[in-house]
Structures are given as C-alpha cells and as structure tokens.
C-alpha cells in the first residue's frame, strides 16, 4: 500500500527552497501522527532538510528509503535507492511517500492513497505539486478546520 502525504495551498505550492511556506502546528501534528515510526520514502534534498531540522535527534520514522541519482551515496540511517520506478512497482508493504516535489511526481502513478492537507490561502514559494487526475481517486474522508482541509483520496 503506497500512501502519499503532503500539504499544499490552492496553487499546489508545497515548498519554498527547503522549507514549508507556512507553519501550522495542527498540520505538523497530523503529519507526525500518520508517519511516526512508519516506513517512508523521500528524496535526497528532503532527507537533508529533515536532518538539518532534527539536528542530532534521529528522524521520527521507521525504515527510511532515500531516492537519489547518486549511486555512490551512503547514508548511516537510511537505505538509498537509485531506481524509484522499480522500487515502487515491486514494493508490497505499507509505505509513506513524504517528499519532495520530484519524488511526489515520480510516485503518484503508484499511489493507493493520497493524504492531502489543503492549506487555505496563497503563499510564496518555488516548489509545486504536479497536477493530479482526481478521476482515479475517490474522496473517502475529509475534515475542515480554520486553516486546513484534511482529505483522504483512495484509488478507484
């Protein structure tokens, strides 16, 4: 089961450099509750951004897969994968795709569930989520707060 989780504004903005363009505590809690201790897939830039945020503390995930084109890359606390298509096609267990933009784009064709936090308003940044063909998914859950509409889409 391949799950993708992200927050985006109404223009599909998801990032500003290596940062999230907003700080919404409830959304961070939601993300942590879904991904803590889970097997995750992320890109190399996202990995280094999170390592910078957590500093000497370990990342709050179970097994960490990092997608990279660098075949020489070795990471102490993660498994490096160089062929994301083969990895996603063959992966059979629960997996959470947690970013960034390129990894989301490459993972979307394989995703069974989309956990999307729609952040209200427009923000400034430079990283966008690709277009989604929502006809391939059913909206099965949503909850709205003042700042965010949380949704779950499941593949038809």
Explain the meaning of each model-derived region:
Residues 1-156:
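Enzymes that bind and transform nitrogen-containing heteroaromatic metabolites
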């Amino acid at each position: 089961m391949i799950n993708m989780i992200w927050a985006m504004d109404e223009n599909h903005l998801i990032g500003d450099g290596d940062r999230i363009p907003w700080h919404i505590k409830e959304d961070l809690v939601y993300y942590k509750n879904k991904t803590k201790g889970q097997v995750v897939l992320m890109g190399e830039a996202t990995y280094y951004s999170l390592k910078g945020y957590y500093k000497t503390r370990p990342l709050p995930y179970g097994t960490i897969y990092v997608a990279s084109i660098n075949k020489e890359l070795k990471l102490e606390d993660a498994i490096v994968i160089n062929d994301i298509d083969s990895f996603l096609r063959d992966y059979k267990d629960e997996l959470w795709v947690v970013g960034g933009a390129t990894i989301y784009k490459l993972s979307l064709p394989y995703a069974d569930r989309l956990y999307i936090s729609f952040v209200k308003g427009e923000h400034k940044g430079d990283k966008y989520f690709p277009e989604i063909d929502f006809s391939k998914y059913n909206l099965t859950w949503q909850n709205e707060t003042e700042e965010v509409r949380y949704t779950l889409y499941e593949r038809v």
